[in-house]
UniProtKB/Swiss-Prot annotation:
Organism: Mycobacterium tuberculosis (strain ATCC 25177 / H37Ra)
GO CC terms: cytosol
Positions bound to ADP: 24, 28, 283, 327, 428, 432
NCBIfam families: glycerol_kin, PRK00047.1
Residue positions binding sn-glycerol 3-phosphate: 24, 94-95, 146, 261
Regulation: Inhibited by fructose 1,6-bisphosphate (FBP).
Annotated catalysed reactions: glycerol + ATP = sn-glycerol 3-phosphate + ADP + H(+)
Gene expressing this chain: glpK
Protein name per UniProt: Glycerol kinase
Function: Key enzyme in the regulation of glycerol uptake and metabolism. Catalyzes the phosphorylation of glycerol to yield sn-glycerol 3-phosphate.
Ligand binding (ATP): 24-26, 283, 327, 331, 428
Keywords: ATP-binding, Glycerol metabolism, Kinase, Nucleotide-binding, Transferase
Annotated family: Belongs to the FGGY kinase family.
Length: 517
């Protein structure tokens, strides 16, 4: 929808919620109405910094500047003033790790992104000496390069002056939600240093039962507690803070919702009951299953995480399968191979062939996440023959997205004992009809996309709105959810089984490729 849509009409009403979505490749601000309908947005990309193989960084200053710009632009384009916004929510790429000076606001180092694998030796050592079991038991996570704890340890050990600053109380840690919130509420002039339970649950540092930083876990990574933010509800009864009047919003708006991006998508998809699941297709894929107030420990390579917490209610938990490379594999076809000029062309190219021609592509660029958790894996194209073309590679790339999701669904069913009946989907790739049809075929269940596909921003808008009474209760959110498109399986059982067997065989070829000992 156009940035300027509705123009002056919007300013006649105060019935709007703003949502900041600070993602891996871009930052956007979106405005929603009472019906959960998007009425405006503005979005800006930021640089992907790749200093060496396996390292991925972002510039924290650029992230904040992009956040300020999208806020200013969407408010200006719609003629909205701060008094027209009932509340503001923040959702973000999780695990990405920032450290900055509380007095100057200057970062000590670039943000280390969730995809970054420089901490593989830290993670491997934790598992080798048995300490990984403590992390699994308390934090619900396996020791992996994915999570914030190892990234923060790396900064403390490798960036001059950071450990001393942390021990003196001068250095602050946060994921992007904390960084954006701190700057919006004043930065060095009294900015609020806080995160929510969902983001904290992705650090390997928070106890899932107490919802607090755990001293035993902190000691594993030698992290001073003083540098950590306060942990709060995803939609607290009192605002985290208010936007600084002299900041990009131009007035005081309460900030009342914070959710990690995948948790926000769960809320946006209204997966609020145990057994409901969604799959978000972005840079990576993230499939979550609501397990209610029960902490379900995975025996099949999944993560146990906080799904959300509203107000002072008990937290709701989830099982999650995190997949590192899905949408970014399509970007690889565009940026590194040059066989497409835009992501949308992947569908047209893949439609030139009826199948993958016996070729499988496993995009383990930075190892494999759920359910394998193998940082020693690297990408591979297998089954290649002279018969294969660019079209087969495009098809195999779309299939890789879907087969990785099948890996997670199978693990989820084994852990929960719940057979998936339908999969709600969201994210950019859901606009690719062929990919979604393949997903239905690979899983053998219907795949359903909602009218509002940007469920991440919508979810945190819901959280922020619930906190201020913009929506009275979660039941109001269900009335807003509407189906846009449904894909029904066309493969028979034999075709489905044969295709998946080939995928599993291909995955085995990617293992033990790099030494992480």
């Amino acid at each position: 929808m156009s940035d300027a849509i509705l123009g002056e009409q919007l300013a006649e009403s105060s019935d709007f919620i703003a949502a900041i979505d600070q993602g891996t490749t871009s930052t956007r601000c979106m405005i929603f109405d009472h019906h959960g309908a998007e009425v405006a947005r503005h979005q800006l990309e930021h640089e992907q910094i790749l200093p060496r193989a396996g390292w991925v960084e972002h510039n924290p200053v650029e992230i904040w500047e992009r956040t300020a710009s999208v806020l200013i632009s969407v408010l200006n384009a719609t003629n909205l003033s701060p008094k027209d916004i009932a509340a503001l929510g923040i959702t973000n790429q999780r695990e990405t790790t920032l450290v900055w000076n509380r007095h100057t606001g200057r970062p000590y180092y670039n943000a280390i992104v969730w995809q970054d694998t420089r901490t593989d030796r830290i993670a491997s050592a934790l598992d080798r000496d048995g300490r990984g079991n403590l992390i699994r038991r308390k934090a619900g996570l396996p020791p992996a390069t994915y999570f914030s704890g190892g990234k923060l340890q790396w900064i403390l050990e490798n960036v001059d002056g950071v450990r001393a600053a942390a021990e003196n109380g001068d250095a602050l840690f946060g994921t992007p939600d904390t960084w954006v919130l701190w700057n919006l509420t004043g930065g060095p002039r009294g900015g609020v240093h806080v995160t929510d339970v969902t983001n904290a649950s992705r650090t390997m540092l928070m106890d899932l039962e107490t919802l607090d930083w755990d001293d035993e876990l902190l000691s594993l990574f030698s992290i001073p507690r003083a540098m950590l933010p306060e942990i709060a509800s995803s939609a607290p009864s009192e605002p985290y803070g208010v936007t600084l009047a002299t900041g990009p919003v131009g007035g005081e708006v309460p900030i009342t919702g914070v959710l990690g991006d995948q948790h926000a998508a769960m809320v946006g998809q209204v997966c609020l009951a145990p057994g409901e699941a969604k799959n978000t297709y972005g840079t990576g894929n993230f499939l979550l299953l609501n397990t209610g107030e029960t902490i379900v420990r995975s025996n099949n390579g999944l993560l146990t995480t906080v799904c959300y917490q509203f107000g002072n209610a008990k937290p709701v938990y989830a099982l999650e399968g995190s997949i590192a490379v899905t949408g970014s594999a399509v970007q690889w076809l565009r940026d590194q191979l040059g066989i497409i000029s835009g992501a949308a062309q992947s569908e047209a190219l893949a439609r030139q062939v009826p199948d993958n021609g016996g070729m499988y592509f496993v995009p383990a660029f930075s190892g494999l996440f759920a359910p394998y958790w193998r940082s020693d894996a690297r990408g591979a194209i297998v089954g290649l023959s002279r018969f294969n073309t660019n079209a087969h590679l495009a098809r195999a790339t779309l299939e890789a997205i879907c087969y990785q999701s099948r890996d997670v669904v199978d693990a989820m069913e084994a852990d929960s004992g719940v057979r998936l009946q339908v999969l709600k989907v969201d994210g950019g790739i859901t606009g690719n009809d062929l990919c979604m049809q393949i997903q239905a075929d690979v899983l053998g269940v219907d795949v359903v996309r909602p009218v509002v596909a940007e469920t991440t921003a919508l979810g945190v808008a819901y959280a922020a709105g619930l906190a201020v009474g913009f929506w009275a209760a979660p039941s109001d959110l269900r009335a807003n959810w509407r189906e846009d498109k449904r894909w029904t399986p066309t493969w028979d059982d034999d075709e489905r089984a044969a295709g998946y067997a080939g995928w599993r065989k291909a995955v085995q070829r990617t293992l033990d490729w790099v030494d992480v000992s």
